Amino acid sequence: LLFIKRNIYIVPLYNICYMKKPFVHKKYLKLYEETAKNKIAGILFKYPDKEFSLSDLAREAGVAKANIGNILNEFQKAGLITVEKLSKIWRIKANQANWLFIRNKIVYNLGFVYRSGLVEFLVEHFKNPKAIVLFGSFRKGEDLSGSDVDIAIESNEVSDYQIIELRELIEFEKIIERRIQIHLFKRESIDEN
């Protein structure tokens, strides 16, 4: 069963919302397609602490090994990655100290949260809360493979600050491949100091 509500597809079986794809004129379609560069960058953003061989990275990203060399050279020149060549083996790792990498990782993380449908779910589950705030290492682009996603929700329906876990978030955690922590608070009960 699929219900449509305000350009959002709602799949009740999984309690996950998927945004409707926008209609795009053919000449602009290339802007929306996922390119080989985006796929490789996505893997590096998702696993910034992992070291890849050329073959591993190509396989993870779903990109032909023959095409990956030029992309990696471009990423290396921009300082996004470090490449160590040991004879025929390449060791490729994200350069987490590079400001350009961090900035792009923040954009990737925010986009990832929106594409997963998590924001729409939280708005509906918490009955249109006053604020939903993404914070912590995931928001700063400093998250690693094992990091969690910290989300604060301002609601008048709670009396004290509390950290909760929702059973419904399990599906989102599978999509994002991160644990999600919800921090509920009421602005009046928070100490400003």
Please place each PLM-identified region on the residue numbering.
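Catalytic core of pol beta-like nucleotidyltransferases
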Residues: L2-N128, K140-G146, S155-N193
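Short helix-loop-helix/strand-helix junction enriched in hydrophobic and basic residues
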Residues: A131-F138
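Short, well-ordered beta-strand segments
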Residues: D150-A152
